[in-house]
């Protein structure tokens, strides 16, 4: 069974990173910075997301329907190496989310970020394909969250079984206090 377009089914875990870190040798490293709440500065038009009259991204009919039908969105602007991705994400169940994404020019991303500061996190992500074919994303957080390591795996269905790597710890799927947004908001409150 294929996951419907714009749907994401994933499980999340705390990683035991006290000793060996085998995901570093097995995966590609990507630098990521994520800013939350940028959607407050965006307007949703018939066919575009705009910021102060400037088009940020084109919106398809299907995306527009989702934006109209769902009211509980988390908005995120992610810098992944040199690429910026704007995301609207809404949790449907503990492990399933509706996710809309657009690539944004670096110029427009900088314009959006000028409205901040926004709650944010920085991390290095290692993308690891295991022998069973599952792709794990292992995030080593930086800054005030240094030492925290989380992992997630995307699935085709909520009941799909997956073999856990030896470094996987406690499952945190569906625990909102462990979402990247919640971590970013906690850091923002503590630094205020």
Role assignments for model-derived ranges:
Residues 1-192:
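Phosphate-end processing signature that detects enzymes handling 5′-triphosphorylated RNA
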């Amino acid at each position: 069974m294929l996951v419907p377009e714009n749907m994401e089914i994933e499980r999340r875990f705390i990683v035991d990173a006290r000793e060996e870190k085998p995901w570093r040798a097995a995966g590609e490293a990507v630098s990521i910075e994520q800013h939350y709440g940028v959607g407050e500065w965006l307007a949703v038009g018939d066919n575009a997301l705009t910021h102060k009259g400037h088009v940020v991204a084109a919106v398809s009919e299907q995306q527009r329907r989702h934006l109209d039908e769902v009211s509980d969105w988390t908005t995120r602007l992610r810098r992944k190496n040199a690429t910026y991705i704007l995301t609207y994400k809404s949790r449907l169940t503990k492990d399933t989310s509706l996710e809309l994404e657009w690539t944004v020019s670096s110029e427009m991303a900088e314009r959006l970020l000028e409205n901040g500061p926004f709650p944010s996190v920085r991390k290095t992500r290692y993308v690891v394909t295991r022998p069973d074919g599952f792709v794990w994303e292992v995030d080593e957080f930086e800054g005030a969250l240094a030492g925290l390591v989380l992992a997630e795996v995307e699935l085709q269905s909520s009941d799909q079984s997956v073999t856990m790597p030896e470094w996987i710890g406690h499952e945190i799927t569906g625990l909102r206090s462990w979402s990247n947004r919640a971590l970013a908001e906690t850091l923002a409150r503590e630094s205020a």
